[in-house]
Amino acid sequence: MTRPVLFGLGDLAERLEGLVGAEPGTDGAPSPVDTAMAYVHVGQLFASAEPRVVTTILGSCVSVCLWDPQAGVGGLNHFLLPQAVENGISSARFGNVAIRHLLDEIAGLGGQAARLKAKVFGGASVIDAFQSPQNTLGMQNVALARSVLNDAGIPVVAEDVGGAQGRKLVFQTRDGSAWVRKI
């Protein structure tokens, strides 16, 4: 059994293994039954070759979900800022770093870049209410995600970005499905 990769949580990664979710509700969310769950905070990422339900809450932050349908490997990140301005910074709080780290982790679990599918979520204007909708921090994060994925040749097959509301994201590594609720 391969061990899921969870960055930034220390021993919490071990405590998350083996958790079983509750019965699915009537709101259309993916069923977490018999699947371990993980929550990804800002500046973290998660990748697994095992079935996992991964959740996060997004405002102006962005999550890129990647999935290799043939290998059954998937994961997501949660980044705060588009890119590091200083050389040598490798924090997953920055989109350019977080996406590269996620690509590396998925490759390490058997995923291949040529087969990856991407989904992009977040980028709301929850703080930038008085800026132009195209120039908010959230939309800068979205633009960076699209650019890095495009440069890597990874198609974005779904997205829910922008707007003025945050989002709760639920992603399943087993089949690449995602569920989003505006909050």
PLM feature segments, named:
Residues 1-183:
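Active-site microenvironment for binding and transforming phosphate-containing groups
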